[in-house]
């Protein structure tokens, strides 16, 4: 992509997404995340009315009467965007590809973090770690992330959510807010997700094109796997073929849901045929009420 064209796209996306941040989203981000990080400060003697869950049992045993832990809010948070750039992200039947929506949502989250003076970083992944941008503050850094997301051309096309989470668990030591933006057309990442979810506040953002839910009955067509490049003829009118595809899609979706539920992690479903801001805002408002 030419530099002039790239800068134009970045500017257009910045105007659109920062408008959404200012008008709709930043309040939800601030309410849910700002000050949620807590760090240990000191201990003091237990007083009537204190939350018994904060009792420090080691100190209590040592002095033979109860002490509680005092925590302070961590005003500065770190937001990490794990963005799937594999081949399946270049699909879209609704005028925009999954990757386009992933870029816009990432921009909204990056600008929200910037507006709240938080650090933001990004990890772009396929079945390899394509690019890692360490978390930093500031407008220029948020714009750098947006530029990379718009212009980046991955070297690989397959998907490994496990690989991305393992890398995250290795490089990011401080507890962070982690968004995994993907269609989650993958498996065998449950252990890595559970570990990452214990270390970080992890939220999945699943992108779904409605055309992917079932095969359209259009007769004999050539299908190309966006991640492997393999091609084959498929009779979409064959009921057995349609049933097998539907069963596969259900198994992938059931695995994703069960994995997030078991790890006690939140996720958001974003359909490409509907505006993405409503499910995002609804989710954060629901989460704010839970706090």
Model-derived features: positions:
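Von Willebrand factor type A / integrin I
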Residues: 1-33, 42, 51, 170-174, ...
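Short, flexible loop segments at the rims of nucleotide/cofactor-binding pockets, characterized by
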Residues: 58, 154-158, 180-182
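Active-site flanking residues adjacent to catalytic metal/cofactor-binding acidic residues
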Residues: 83, 182, 205
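Von Willebrand factor
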Residues: 141-176, 188, 209
């Amino acid at each position: 992509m030419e530099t002039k064209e790239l800068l134009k796209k970045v500017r257009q996306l910045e105007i659109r997404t920062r408008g959404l941040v200012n008008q709709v989203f930043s309040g939800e981000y601030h309410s849910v995340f700002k000050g949620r990080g807590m760090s240990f400060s000191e201990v003091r003697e237990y007083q009537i009315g204190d939350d018994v869950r904060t009792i420090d049992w080691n100190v209590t045993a040592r002095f033979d009467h109860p002490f509680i832990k005092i925590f302070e809010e961590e005003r500065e948070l770190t937001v990490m965007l794990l963005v799937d750039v594999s081949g399946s992200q270049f699909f879209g039947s609704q005028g925009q590809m999954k990757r386009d929506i992933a870029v816009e949502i990432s921009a909204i989250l990056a600008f929200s973090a910037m507006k709240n003076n938080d650090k933001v970083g990004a990890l772009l992944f396929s079945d390899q770690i394509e690019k890692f941008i360490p978390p930093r503050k500031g407008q220029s850094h948020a714009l750098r992330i947006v530029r990379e997301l718009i212009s980046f051309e991955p070297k690989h096309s397959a998907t490994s959510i496990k690989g991305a989470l393992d890398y995250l668990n290795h490089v990011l030591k401080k507890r962070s807010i982690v968004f995994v933006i993907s269609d989650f057309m993958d498996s065998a990442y449950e252990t890595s997700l559970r570990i990452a979810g214990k270390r970080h506040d992890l939220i999945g953002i699943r992108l779904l094109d409605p055309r992917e839910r079932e095969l359209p009955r259009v007769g004999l067509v050539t299908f190309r796997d966006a991640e492997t490049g393999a091609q084959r003829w498929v009779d979409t009118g064959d009921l057995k073929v349609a049933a097998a595809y539907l069963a596969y899609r259900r198994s992938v979706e059931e695995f994703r849901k069960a994995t997030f539920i078991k790890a006690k992690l939140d996720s958001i479903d974003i359909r490409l045929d509907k505006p993405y801001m409503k499910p995002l805002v609804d989710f954060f408002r629901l989460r704010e009420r839970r706090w």
